[in-house]
């Protein structure tokens, strides 16, 4: 299907098939679609509501046009990249939980970018903490093999996205591009935990992950609006295991937490976000420790290392409080 025909179909309030969406996005990635046509495509799709097939097709195109690793990794990989954009301004919980997971021996290929809606994105906070995020492809792959953690800076691994950049910036609203980024890790991890900015996206994302063939994956959104597991409110999540999707809720009351200070997990500026992140790594933040441990625990659950998220939380919390995670991260950045 030609790009113009795809836009006309969307304008008629019809959804594209996976192949049609993939074809259009392939043209975009090659710089063959005008800004006017791309703007029309993104706007019409947003008005219709992105379907599973459309998100899957766009994801396949982005993956196809990404740089590919030269290394064949002989181990299971996890990514904790979320959509961002929940507008809550929390500390970088998914990034910190990725560090905790790596300190526990999980191989983490963290896919990410600069800030979407928070004061600091995953790239921003890692840089502030001393980890170099913009390195060569060879270094990124070597870090994963030798250290168990690596960061894939999205603009470097998805150079074809430059063709969509000006239109995305000009439109200024969320489009399908905000969805396909977390689904397009170039290392193709078979295990993934994704926090989403709207509860309606949990079903869509888990079905896309199912179509992509992941072994185990979890998509979550908390009832207080976070794109991660919350220590203050119930978190709903969809779960994929061996091709089967199930739906669940996690109530943090089961952890027995009380008198938590929300100010320890909500940042007012980039500098404040860094201060709060360091407090977590230094075991100086009660609420921050619980929040990061809970999300790391969910990662352990996705990896199949424990039977329940609660068990994972206890293991992750001990890693933080014992200084294990701090030592791991200090060793990690000392080799930069």
From Swiss-Prot:
A Pfam short name: Glycos_trans_3N
> Where, by residue number, does Mg(2+) 1 bind?
94, 228
Catalysed reaction equations from the record? N-(5-phospho-beta-D-ribosyl)anthranilate + diphosphate = 5-phospho-alpha-D-ribose 1-diphosphate + anthranilate
Answer yes or no on keyword Metal-binding. yes
Primary enzyme class? transferase
What cofactor requirement does the entry state? Mg(2+)
Residues binding anthranilate 2: 168
Give me the residues that bind 5-phospho-alpha-D-ribose 1-diphosphate, please: 82, 85-86, 90, 92-95, 110-118, 122
> What pathway is it annotated to?
Amino-acid biosynthesis; L-tryptophan biosynthesis; L-tryptophan from chorismate: step 2/5
Q: How is the cofactor bound?
A: Binds 2 magnesium ions per monomer.
Which residues of the sequence carry a binding annotation for Mg(2+) 2?
227-228
Signal peptide coordinates:
none
Q: Does the keyword Plastid apply?
A: no
Q: In the record, what terms sit under GO molecular function?
A: anthranilate phosphoribosyltransferase activity; magnesium ion binding
Which residues are listed for anthranilate 1 binding in this entry? Answer: 82, 113
| One GO term of the biological process aspect | L-tryptophan biosynthetic process
Q: Which family does it belong to?
A: Belongs to the anthranilate phosphoribosyltransferase family.
Which HAMAP family does the record cross-reference, listed alphabetically?
TrpD
Assembly information from the UniProt record: Homodimer.
Describe the task this protein carries out. Catalyzes the transfer of the phosphoribosyl group of 5-phosphorylribose-1-pyrophosphate (PRPP) to anthranilate to yield N-(5'-phosphoribosyl)-anthranilate (PRA).
Q: What is this protein called?
A: Anthranilate phosphoribosyltransferase
Protein source organism: Leptospira interrogans serogroup Icterohaemorrhagiae serovar Lai (strain 56601)
Q: Which gene is annotated as encoding this protein in its UniProt record?
A: trpD
